Regions:
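Cleavable N-terminal export/targeting peptides
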Residues: 1-34, 287-290
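Hydrophobic, lipid-facing positions within transmembrane beta-strands of outer-membrane proteins
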Residues: 36-38, 106-110, 162-168, 233-239, ...
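Outer-envelope beta-barrel architecture signal
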Residues: 5, 30-38, 118-122, 178-184, ...
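Predominantly the C-terminal beta-signal and adjacent terminal strand-loop region
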Residues: 235-290
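Transmembrane beta-strands of outer-membrane beta-barrel pores
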Residues: 42-48, 126-132, 172-174, 188-194, ...
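Extracellular/periplasm-exposed beta-strand and loop segments of Gram-negative cell-envelope proteins
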Residues: 51-59, 64-103, 130-165, 191-232, ...
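Membrane-embedded beta-strands that build the outer-membrane beta-barrel scaffold
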Residues: 110-112, 122-126, 170, 239, ...
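Outer-membrane beta-barrel proteins
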Residues: 21-27, 46, 116-118, 168-177, ...
Length: 290
């Protein structure tokens, strides 16, 4: 987690707590907390890295160019050589990205629940995150003389996607009503992934490799095929603490979700764990606490 993201989370957490402490909720029996509640979520998504291999440039689907074939197109070669110089006239791809992975990302969203009493609630969340993935590939070309070692240059290839999670769950409080409590929550989860781009940069030139393919007999044209939004159903569970105030509840929890994401035909669609620590500030609009 970067220092910038840590600072953002701490500032928001402080603002939430200060706002919620204006009025404390009188603690009573289980019926004191009842009715509809709405709120905001902010978390830090740590996704499973396996689906990210869609963006690493390695051979995937027939008919689409992998990184090696893309760099081998004569007009792409001309552009790369113009950037790197004539010394790179005989360049080749030396190494595909290794250990390709997502970067962790900030996730934000909304929350709604119906609280039956202090102990039981039905909850729903919708969270959004923009994920970026990155890896390094290596280009090799001969040295300036036949006696020198080959020259290796490294470049970054990246992918970017929007991910949405929609969950419907059941929350149960573990223990008697209190200003400080522990809760367990679980339920089904719908995940949707919208791929935005897959590209790399050499010098000032950016190349899009997202489902790149040649155009018929055209010798110098490439197009990028579209990829539809990928959706799947999984599940989640979370364990956390909650602070109770007059009309506010502040949840602090760790959510573990099992999501079945496959971004290309050859990728196995299996449940993979994703982790998300988060804060959730909820305000009670109706019921006994108002």
């Amino acid at each position: 987690m970067s220092k910038k993201h840590i600072l953002i989370l701490l500032c928001l957490w402080h603002a939430m707590v200060v706002s919620a402490q204006d009025e404390e909720r009188p603690i009573g029996g289980p019926s004191e907390k009842k009715g509809f509640m709405f709120g905001l979520n902010i978390g830090y998504l740590m996704p499973n890295d396996e689906p990210a291999t869609f963006y690493d440039g390695k051979p995937k689907e027939q008919g689409f160019l992998d990184l090696n074939a893309f760099l081998g197109q004569w007009f792409i070669r001309d552009q790369v050589i113009n950037t790197l110089g004539d010394r790179a006239a005989n360049y080749r791809l030396s190494e595909y990205p290794q250990d390709y992975r997502y970067n962790n990302a900030l996730a934000i969203g909304g929350h709604v629940r119906y609280q039956f009493n202090w102990t039981h609630a039905v909850v729903a969340d919708m969270n959004f995150a923009r994920l970026r993935s990155a890896g390094i590939f290596v280009i090799e070309y001969p040295g300036t003389t036949g006696l020198t070692q080959p020259v290796f240059e490294s470049f970054e290839i990246t992918g970017e996607e929007d991910r949405m999670n929609l969950s419907l769950g059941y929350q149960v409080a573990l223990g008697a009503p209190s200003e400080f409590g522990v809760h367990l929550e679980f339920g089904p989860l719908l995940t949707s992934v919208n791929v935005r781009n897959n590209q790399f940069r050499i010098g000032d030139q950016t190349y899009s490799i997202l489902r790149a393919q040649t155009v018929g007999q055209a010798p110098d044209q490439l197009i990028n095929g579209q990829i539809t939004t990928v959706s799947s159903v999984g599940g989640y569970g979370q364990l956390g603490t909650n602070l109770e105030f007059h009309k506010f509840t502040l949840d602090m929890a760790l959510r573990v979700s099992l999501e079945k994401i496959a971004l290309y035909a050859g990728q196995e669609a299996k449940f993979r764990p994703n982790y998300q620590p988060f804060l959730r500030l909820i305000y009670q609009l109706s019921g006994s606490g108002s």
